[in-house]
């Protein structure tokens, strides 16, 4: 995502502030409204999102509300950006930040001038992570598909005494003749093979 498109999209963001009512929540909501985001604040954490949410700002409490926040985030989309609000740093709080896979952290007391830079960098990080996850899944599918094709080649080589090139040519010819991907031909061939 380019800098211009990222900055331009800030006004379209649906933001949820998961924090008890008070000065911190009020200041954060006000700053997010100044940025141009559509903001809702709620506490305690709901069981699910009632509307789509792009960004969640949530307080991290030492061993409290962690499970509820984790369950809520798991129910969201993989592209939801998460920013932690941290009152103090302790091993338990840092562990929760890592477990929740936060994209950004704002320490308290809240400085309104930190909200925009953290929002922009967290949003960019979450978008990049979502793209990388999608690419990883695609690569895993391709590798699994190639493994199936190689299994089909091995079967043809064993069955007909062919070398790998001949087995590949056979799969390619069948795929072109039937106008199907080679993977589909390989899967059909392997699916028709009696199990040992």
UniProtKB/Swiss-Prot annotation:
InterPro entries: AmiR_N, ANTAR, CheY-like_superfamily, Sig_transdc_resp-reg_antiterm, WH-like_DNA-bd_sf
Molecular-function annotations in GO: RNA binding
Top-level taxon in the UniProt lineage: Bacteria
This protein's record includes keyword Membrane: no
Keyword Transcription: yes
Keywords, ordered alphabetically: Transcription, Transcription antitermination, Transcription regulation
PROSITE patterns linked: ANTAR
Gene Ontology BP terms: carbon utilization; cellular catabolic process; regulation of amide catabolic process; transcription antitermination
Domain ANTAR, first and last residues per copy: 129-190
Subunit organization: Forms a complex with AmiC.
Main function: Positive controlling element of AmiE, the gene for aliphatic amidase. Acts as a transcriptional antitermination factor. It is thought to allow RNA polymerase read through a rho-independent transcription terminator between the AmiE promoter and gene.
Record protein name field: Aliphatic amidase regulator
Encoding gene per record: amiR
């Amino acid at each position: 995502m380019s800098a211009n498109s990222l900055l331009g999209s800030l006004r379209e963001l649906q933001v949820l502030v998961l924090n008890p009512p008070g000065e911190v929540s009020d200041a954060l909501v006000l700053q997010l409204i100044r940025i141009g985001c559509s903001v809702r604040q709620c506490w305690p954490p709901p069981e699910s999102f009632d509307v789509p949410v792009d960004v969640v700002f949530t307080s991290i409490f030492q061993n409290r509300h962690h499970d509820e926040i984790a369950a809520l985030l798991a129910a969201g989309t993989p592209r939801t950006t998460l920013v932690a609000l941290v009152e103090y740093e302790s091993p338990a709080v840092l562990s929760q930040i890592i477990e929740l896979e936060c994209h950004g952290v704002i320490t308290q007391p809240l400085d309104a001038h930190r909200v925009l830079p953290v929002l922009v960098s967290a949003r960019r990080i979450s978008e990049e992570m979502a793209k990388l996850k999608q690419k990883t899944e695609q690569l895993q599918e391709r590798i699994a598909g190639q493994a199936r094709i190689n299994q089909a080649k091995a079967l043809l080589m064993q069955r007909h005494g062919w070398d790998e090139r001949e087995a590949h040519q056979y799969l390619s010819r069948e795929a072109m003749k039937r106008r199907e991907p080679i993977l589909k031909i390989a899967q059909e061939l392997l699916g028709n093979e009696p199990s040992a």
